[in-house]
Regions:
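Short, solvent-exposed loop/turn segments at secondary-structure junctions
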Residues: 11, 57-58, 134, 169-170, ...
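Phosphate-binding site of ATP-dependent enzymes
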Residues: 144-226, 230, 241, 248
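A short, glycine/Asx- and small/polar-enriched loop/turn
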Residues: 44-49, 120-124, 243-248
Length: 281
């Protein structure tokens, strides 16, 4: 019986409610599933046929350790999903710059690995500053530029790489769109709406989610983004905003995204079928 480990983290060592929906389908297809904490040194990862990253939601707090763990799966019989190459590239949000250069419409962004002058931000009322390695709005802040001094800006981005973006009020009005792809094919979408007075779209900050049906044009645009970002992805989630009928990419999640299976009837089966397909290749 083939064995698959779902990589989790210490604060949620068992499977998430979403991932539990996958287990009976995997079992029906002859697979054994077990949750394993990604940084548990006692785990023998290579006894598994495959490891699927699902809820390693503290990886950005231990980024060097996480990158080292991912690299262990290079050139091994144990398949990692997504692949080490895909994951290593996706951990640092400067991948957006590469996608921008390939013609993808990305939210206007300053990619800061060095000093940014306050004068460069003139004409923008509010900005969002976020770390290039992060998740779940970790250390993401909104600033009014008229109240922002060079000293405050320098202090905020003094270490590491950061993204600076104009704050787009449309996220409060229209919500953020998430389009999920499984095995490279479109599966389903949701709209995430922040609570009144907030901009963050995570449920822990009071956001609400609902099913969303994108048109074919948007699906094709998102699929093109996935194809430009990486090949042979088991899962990918394209997050962005629609502004004046243009889709602007915020990020593409290919490490440990919530795939929102509760908003789709076919998603869990599609996920399992894509896994089986990739494991055979």
């Amino acid at each position: 019986m083939p064995k698959i480990a779902f990589a989790t983290y210490l604060s949620l060592p068992s499977l998430s409610d979403n991932d539990r929906l996958l287990v009976p389908i995997f079992k029906e297809n002859g697979f054994e599933i077990k949750a394993e904490i990604w940084d548990d040194e006692s785990v023998d990862w290579f006894k598994y046929d495959a490891v699927i990253i699902r809820s390693t939601w503290d990886y950005f707090l231990k980024s060097e350790k996480f990158l080292s763990w991912i690299s262990k799966f290079k050139n091994t019989k144990t398949q990692l999903f997504n692949s080490p190459e895909v994951v290593l590239n996706n951990t640092h949000k400067f991948y957006l710059k590469s996608l921008q250069q390939k013609g993808v419409s990305v939210i206007p962004t300053w990619f800061s690995s060095q000093k940014i002058l306050i004068e460069e931000l003139k004409g923008i009322q509010k900005i969002v500053i976020k770390p290039a390695v992060s998740g779940g709005s970790y250390e993401t802040e909104v600033f009014e530029t008229k109240l922002l001094s060079q000293e405050i800006l320098d202090k905020k981005i003094k270490q590491g790489d950061w993204l600076i973006q104009p704050f787009l009020s449309q996220i409060k009005e229209n919500g953020e769109l998430s389009l999920i792809f499984l095995g490279g094919e479109y599966s389903h979408s949701i709209k995430k709406i922040p609570k009144k007075g907030d901009f963050r779209v995570q449920k822990q900050f009071g956001a609400t989610y609902k099913h969303f049906e994108p048109d074919l044009k948007l699906i094709e645009k998102a699929k093109n983004i996935v194809q430009l970002a990486a090949e042979n992805t088991l899962y990918a989630r394209v997050d962005g905003l629609e502004i004046e009928n243009e889709f602007l990419l915020m990020e593409i999640e290919m490490i440990e995204p919530d795939l929102f299976f509760e908003y789709t009837k076919t998603g869990p089966l599609d996920f399992v079928n894509a896994t089986i397909k990739y494991m055979k290749n």
